[in-house]
Amino acid sequence: QAYKELIPSDGPVRTQVVGEVTREKEQQAQRVKEFMNYMLMEVMEEYTPDFDQLLFYLPLAGSAFKKIYYDEVLERAVSKFVAAEDLIVPYYTTHLSECERITHVIKMSENEIFKKQKAGFYRDIDLQQTDEEDEVQDKYNEIEGVSRTDRGDNYQYSILEMHVHLDLDEYTTDQDDKKIKIPYIVTIDEGSQKILSIYRNYRPDDPQFRRKEYFVHFKFLPGLGFYG
């Protein structure tokens, strides 16, 4: 029932004219609504299945996330489901918007990483596999009745995408700016501990250096901790 309410057949986007309502504004709002629903329901192929997966996962784990970002390889916006165990925040965190370090653990095949390296988004480094077992994923596999196969060419590398605040001298021109850490996204290959990329995570014309938010938090029930 939740899926039908959140994603109706004509799309989830609704628009509202704020302020004086005119015919031109209403027509513009309708165009925005139609375009956004077209993007979500037709172009972004992962949107509906990932949202369905999130709704199924939410009561099992109590917490789940959506990650909305621009994919350099696909050259379009992407909205993906992120499991609670794959998004790590400091112990004291109460809300994502106030958290200064968010780590997204991403599983990527070698080919996916090569694509990003070829596109110039990742550095060309030697990747290294890890021997660590994912106990949480193993438990999910047990519930689903599936098991791991030999790694072979299907090995998934652990990529750590960290949304952090840093003081990088080479990226600051004003001496006063060095006193304040500003938002960056640092991506690391967990196996080799080498940096794949560092990108700023704020708009160039923003004097406040406000972080661009990538994640949306869904809680099944409120709780005492961050994850509900």
Regions found by a protein language model. Give the residues of each.
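Extended alpha-helical, oligomerization-prone segments that build pores/tubes and scaffolds
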Residues: 1-228
